[in-house]
Amino acid sequence: MDAMTFDKLERALMNADRAARQFAKSEDNGTCNFDTPVIRIKATEKQMASLDYRVVKVGEKGWKDCWFVFIPLMGQGKRRTRMAEAAARSLIADGFEAGVYYQMD
């Protein structure tokens, strides 16, 4: 990943964090889940480790170049889902391929 892409990604992660926080005080009913934004980008683990946000490689087959994005998500039910979806929409708006990994407990 080149320096320009890295800077763009850092700004996009800050924007995603802000977008998610808009739902921080929303209703948190529903089932427990581990929904998390995911971004697809070619980068090394060393590059991603230097970001201000914790980003962890998804090691599963079919998830090539995908990374879990651990921005602060509050709650464990529908609030967490809304926050993860808002973060993913923000990453997409900033030009990255992103989505949400949905997992219920």
Regions found by a protein language model. Give the residues of each.
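Short, compact, well-ordered microdomains
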Residues: 67-105
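N-terminal leader/targeting segments
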Residues: 1-57, 62
